[in-house]
């Protein structure tokens, strides 16, 4: 049929943990079947006195690491913990077969930090208003 618009009644769901797990698993199966894309996800954390004081997440797929959510507690910033954390995530990714790393950061976050650790900008766009997002990568 042509000329007809389908307007399904979508449902907004919050919280969405169960629903996301359902369709994300199906999407994962689709990608795995189509191109052998399997995602490995891990977190690196540092605890002091039982509390998490630094952490970051790695997603590995298609031979690449995506660094997500790198965070260091404010009193520990500038002490080398962030560099060690990023290095630990990259080392784990290499151990799992990744040969490239990618991430994004915002203008108020850690662009100079990532540049010091070999990341190169490959895209930049204005977002959100008054700021910008930088997409970066590097070879591992």
Where are these regions (language model features)?
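Conserved N-terminal entry element of GNAT/NAT acetyltransferase domains
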Residues: 1-15
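Conserved active-site tyrosine of GNAT-family acetyltransferases
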Residues: 23, 114, 119
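Conserved beta-hairpin
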Residues: 41-54
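Conserved beta-strand in the GNAT
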Residues: 51-59, 64-71
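Conserved acetyl-CoA-binding loop-helix of GNAT-fold acetyltransferases
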Residues: 78-91, 116
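Short glycine/proline-centered loop/turn elements that form peptide/ligand docking sites
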Residues: 82, 86, 107-110, 127-133
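Conserved GNAT acetyl-CoA-binding A-motif
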Residues: 93-107
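Conserved catalytic-core motifs of GNAT/GCN5-like acyltransferases
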Residues: 102-104, 120-137
